[in-house]
Amino acid sequence: MNLREKYNIPSSSVITIAGTVGVGKSTMTKALAEALNFRTSYEKVDTNPYLDKFYDDFEKWSFHLQIYFLAERFKEQKRIFEYGGGFIQDRSIYEDTGIFARMHYEKGTMNPTDYETYTNLFNAMVMTPYFPHPDLLIYLEGPVEDVIGRIQERGREMEQQTPHDYWYEMHGRYEDWINNFNSCPVLRIGINDYDLLKNPEQVELIVERIAQMLEQSSLKEKIEGLNYFYRDREKYSELSNEIARVIRPEPAATF
């Protein structure tokens, strides 16, 4: 019996991993996918036609870059749900608008017109009842000093050249974003609570927490559905009584 069956996690579940650079999103994605026998969905940056241009000129290409990311993530989300779920997703569609596009706008590297166009498009595409939101978002978090230490340890050249002030700002923006996020259930996991590279068996502890969150979310949906049903039934009863009074008016009093 695998962990998905042991903890009764639906095979159609879609779980997305979020968090700033260096918190271990890819490691978590891989570990959970193997534990649950799910597929993975990773961010594709090699085929992005705007990335190099963007780094040369933020102001000119920030809007194009964000539109490209939105389109690609939307298509990927659609593909995942058309496949029937069963995916662990590295990075969510929500982070681009909630963090990166907003940062460019606030810093002046995306003009107000482009930012408004982008956010309107995002809201029309994603923030609707028709968009297939994930069943759970796992947010990886930890002290900014530990995050910077991880970034330095893995030694990627572009990241090594990035000033520490940027990582501090990004850490703060992520915290502000997740504290106001409500598009799907959230499970917050501290990066110092587990070490999946040294202790891969710890993934079961995370799977157990995922199962609890999914069960709570399912129960909440059922309760909300019942509340809606009873509210709807009361409205229906009131409407029926009103119609009955119109169709069968009370007889006039006789003297």
Regions found by a protein language model. Give the residues of each.
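Hydrophobic anchor at the beta1->P-loop junction of P-loop NTPases
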Residues: 17
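A glycine- and Lys/Arg-enriched "phosphate-lid" helix/loop adjacent to the NTP-binding pocket
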Residues: 99-172
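Conserved substrate/cofactor phosphate-moiety recognition/catalytic segment
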Residues: 34-73, 99
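P-loop (Walker A) phosphate-binding loop of NTP-binding proteins
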Residues: 20
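NTP-dependent small-molecule kinase module
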Residues: 148-255
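Conserved lysine of the Walker
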Residues: 25
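Extreme N-terminal, non-catalytic leader segments
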Residues: 1-13
